[in-house]
Each structure stands twice: as structure tokens, then as C-alpha cells.
From Swiss-Prot:
InterPro entries: Amidohydro-rel, Hydantoinase/dihydroPyrase, Metal-dep_hydrolase_composite, Metal_Hydrolase, Metallo-dep_Hydrolases_sf. GO terms for cellular component: cytosol; nucleus. SUPFAM superfamilies: Composite domain of metallo-dependent hydrolases (SSF51338), Metallo-dependent hydrolases (SSF51556). Its main location: nucleus. This is Dihydropyrimidinase 1. Binds 2 Zn(2+) ions per subunit. Pfam families: Amidohydro_1.
Length: 489
């Protein structure tokens, strides 16, 4: 157990306020937040003068060590969480994808992910489970895995990757009905996989084989249409829905429309979509272009990143993730001659906190309190771990970042901590640097050096029925009860 720790002279930032205060940590928990805490000899002292003391980031969207199509993502749970803490993130929510098509149950897939993660993680983590096929036993398995014993409160549905991960509309609707019963959140990758497949065939037949084919096979309307459809299906099932990696204006507009109709919809843009655009797919260097291949692709509209940040500021979008899913140059090169074979995925877990500060706070679009909301607090609320996570307060876990808003760093693959030979943010200069990262009261990053211990992070059960998501569910359910007309025979 780490010694007691006192953070002196900093400015505490929560989603609802900023104030000067010291912070005392004992046994991994914040035990006091007040001015001028007296440091005792046995305490470790951190001087946070001119620094912000913020909740550790929560990245709600990662794919560490994920097997897919014969490849495995390069960031395993060790390197991925090392990269996370180096950037100021102290918890990830990773996606577990059971091999449904070979008969693997949700529980068996969950156990496989836990066996990979538990010995390696350097920060806390939770799991979200993908449902890629509906079977007669799926509903029962969903009920089991949302129990406190397993601690899963969300399920992911892919509307893309036909033949592997994609679910049909009827399967997703049936699963959303079960989510509603279990008070579990539906999370959706919104694309039209059937149309994409046909467009891929057409493009290849016309000789389009390079990475530019990836974005051409996925027009922005495809994401907008699927986002709207996911929201419609969720509304019919009375199921709150969370749209992952919102990349385009049309998808964001669909979310805003359904929220205006009273639906419970959350939108998650990612660091890549807030900083980059799709011009990279047309780079003359094949490998450069391939490195940016992800789904949905980056927007071809260069004004989209700023608009997404403004929608975060306005509350029309709600939190930020990364979709950290790393494949190196050799893996990307498997798609030479056929863009559909390029593994989809990019980095982000290390750079999200700086990128969001640069594009949001330093650009004058959001304030530091909104920054905390979209990088940690809202995720903690959605996944039912607030205020244990996502807040600097007595009783909260001591997941804390000493953040220097005035420092700068230039992102580079030469200095990052990913197990990756490139960085999609290469050369971007960011204001806002996580100088010290504290996980459960233990310093894991300081002075530009990792101080991590594999396995020191813990699995955090994510319990169903988050009040932030489901507090109005029963009332909504009653309003949706069918009407029966009594008629004289």
C-alpha cells in the first residue's frame, strides 16, 4: 500500500466547479479536500502550484489485445494501460467480443478477456460485451452477465462488418428489448454494413484498391442513416442507446433530433474525429493513408472536427472516447491491393486528454469544468461508477491527474508508449499535459516516466440500472403500454 499522499496548492476541477484546495489521499481513497491541509512527516507531498487537480480520465471505448480476422491489436492490456496513464487516463472500458459464431457464450468470452487483462492492467478497467448474433440462449446469458457477479452493464451492437460482427435489425431490436428489461445500456456502432459491402464490390471492380476506397465505400450518409435507425429501434424498445465514435455531422444531427423527441441517446465522438479529417486517405503514400483506416472513417469535411467539439460544448454530444484499436504498419500492409483487407483501427488512449484540451479548452470552445465532464465525469455517470470515479471528492477513488494547462507537448511515435510504429496525431502540438497520474492513490506516471506495476489495476464491476440512464425508465415503460379496445361481440 502506498503511503498517504497530499496534493498541495492546486486548483481542483470537477464538472461543476473549480476551487483552490489541497487533497489528502489514504489507502487509495480521497479522504479530505480542503484548504491548507497540514502535511505530516510520513506523507508524500506533491506541489501542484499553477496546476489543475482533475479526475483521472475514463476512456469508455478501447480494444486492447483484440483478436479479429486472424490479427490481434498491438496494444495489449499492459502496453495499452501504460499508454493510458502516461496521458492522464486512469480507467478504460474495453470491449469483449465473444466468438458467437463458434458457439462461445457471453460468459466464456468475458472470462477470456478477464484472463488477458487482470495480470496486465496498470489502471482500472471495466468491460462492455458485444452481441454479434442472436441465439435462443442469448437472453439468458445477458441476464447472467449483468448480475453483480460479472459486473457488465452495457452491450455493443455492430451495424457493420457483415459476416463477422454485424447483427441484423431484428436481432438488435430483440437484444435492445432485453437490455431495457435488464436496465443495461445498448451501445451501437452505426453504419449500414449491407450497403458498404456492395459499394466495396463496386469500387474494387472499378480498380479502386487503395485506402481511398475505404472512405468512398462509406459515404457520410451511411453513418447518419444507421445512427437514425439505431435510435428508432432503441426508441421502439424503450432502450437508452449510446452511439459510439460519432464521426460526422449527419450522425450528430440524428442524435440531436432523437434527443429532441425525448429519447435517451448519448453521443461519443473520439479523439481522432476531434482532431483529424479524411484528407489522409488520399495521401500519395499508401502506408500513410492506410494508417488512418478506421470505421466509420474520418470525415471528409474539414470543418467537422470543430463542429463536433462545439456540440460537446452545447451538450448535444456527451463524452469522448478513443476507439483505441492499434494495428502496426505490417498489419495494415495486409490490405495492399485490396482496401477491404486493411485492418481497421487507430491509436488514441494516450493522447485523448491532451487533444481534447487543445481542441476544446485551449481553442476557447469549452471550459475546464466541461472538459472534466466529457473526459471522465459523464462516463462515470453513464456506467454507474460516479462519484467513485470521475470526481475529486471525499470518498472517491484517488484516480487523480496533476494537469499543467500551460505546458505543451508535440505528439510523436518516437515518444509515445503504444506498441505501435506510428501515431495518427504525429506532429500535433498540444497545450495541456498530464504531468503526474495517480491510480488508486499510487503514482504511476511522473516526470515523464512510467512507474507502473502490471496487474496493479483492478476490474471495476459496472452495475446495471445506472440512475443517470434509467431513472425515468419505469415511467416511460408505462407510457408505452399497449392500448386494448374492448368491443361488443
Amino acid at each position: 500500500m502506498s503511503p498517504p499522499l497530499v496534493i498541495k496548492n492546486g486548483t481542483v476541477v470537477n464538472e461543476d466547479g473549480m476551487f483552490k484546495a489541497d487533497v489528502l489521499v489514504k489507502n487509495g481513497i480521497i479522504v479530505e479536500v480542503s484548504p491548507k491541509i497540514i502535511a505530516l512527516p510520513e506523507m508524500e507531498i506533491i506541489d501542484a502550484t499553477d496546476r489543475l487537480v482533475i479526475p483521472g480520465g475514463i476512456d469508455p471505448h478501447t480494444h486492447m489485445q483484440m483478436p479479429y480476422a486472424g490479427e490481434v491489436t498491438k496494444d495489449d492490456f499492459l502496453r495499452g494501460t501504460q499508454a493510458a496513464v502516461a496521458g492522464g487516463t486512469t480507467m478504460i472500458i474495453d470491449f469483449c467480443c465473444p466468438d458467437h459464431r463458434n458457439g462461445e457464450s457471453l460468459m466464456a468470452g468475458y472470462a477470456r478477456w478477464r484472463s488477458w487483462a487482470d495480470p496486465k492492467v496498470c489502471c482500472d478497467y471495466g468491460l462492455s460485451v458485444a452481441i454479434t448474433q442472436w441465439r435462443p440462449e442469448t437472453a439468458d446469458q445477458m441476464a447472467v452477465i449483468t448480475s453483480p457477479e460479472f459486473g457488465v452493464n452495457s452491450f455493443k451492437f455492430y451495424m457493420a462488418y457483415e459476416g463477422t460482427l454485424m447483427v441484423r435489425d431484428d436481432e438488435m431490436y430483440r437484444a435492445m428489448q432485453e437490455c431495457a428489461k435488464l436496465r443495461a445500456l445498448a451501445r451501437v456502432h452505426a453504419e449500414n454494413g449491407s450497403v458498404i459491402k456492395e459499394r466495396e464490390i463496386d469500387l474494387l471492380a472499378k480498380g479502386v484498391t487503395g485506402p481511398e476506397g475505404h472512405t468512398q465505400s462509406r459515404p457520410e450518409e451511411i453513418e447518419a442513416e444507421a445512427t437514425n435507425r439505431a435510435c428508432v429501434l432503441a426508441a421502439q424498445a424503450n432502450c437508452p442507446v449510446y452511439i459510439v465514435h460519432v464521426m460526422t455531422k449527419g450522425a450528430a444531427a440524428a442524435i440531436s433530433h432523437h434527443r429532441a423527441q425525448g429519447s435517451i441517446v448519448f453521443g461519443e465522438p473520439i479523439a481522432a474525429g476531434l482532431a483529424l479529417d479524411g484528407s489522409h486517405y488520399y495521401n500519395e503514400d499508401w502506408l500513410h493513408a492506410a494508417r488512418y483506416v478506421m470505421s466509420p472513417p474520418l470525415s471528409r469535411d474539414p470543418t467537422t472536427p470543430e463542429l463536433l467539439m462545439k456540440l460537446l460544448a452545447a451538450g448535444e454530444l456527451h463524452l469522448t472516447g478513443t476507439d483505441n484499436c492499434t494495428y502496426d504498419g505490417c498489419q495494415k500492409s495486409l490490405g495492399k491491393g485490396n482496401f477491404t483487407k486493411i485492418p481497421n483501427g487507430i491509436n488514441g488512449v494516450e493522447d485523448r486528454m491532451s487533444v481534447v484540451w487543445e481542441k476544446g479548452v485551449h481553442s476557447g470552445i469549452i471550459d475546464p469544468m466541461r472538459y472534466v465532464s466529457i473526459t471522465s465525469a459523464t462516463a462515470a455517470k453513464i456506467f454507474n461508477i460516479y462519484p467513485k470515479k470521475g470526481r475529486i471528492a471525499v470518498g472517491s477513488d484517488a484516480d487523480i491527474v496533476i494537469f499543467n494547462p500551460n505546458a505543451t507537448r508535440t505528439i510523436s511515435a518516437e515518444t509515445h508508449h503504444h506498441n505501435l510504429d506510428f501515431n495518427i496525431f504525429e506532429g500535433i502540438k498540444c497545450h495541456g499535459v498530464a504531468e503526474i497520474t495517480i491510480s488508486r492513490g499510487r503514482i504511476v506516471w511522473a516526470n515523464g516516466q512510467l512507474q507502473t506495476v502490471p496487474g496493479s489495476g483492478k476490474f471495476v464491476p459496472l452495475l446495471a440500472n445506472s440512475p443517470f440512464v434509467f431513472s425515468s425508465h419505469e415511467i416511460r415503460e408505462k407510457k408505452k403500454e399497449p392500448r386494448i379496445v374492448e368491443r361488443l361481440e
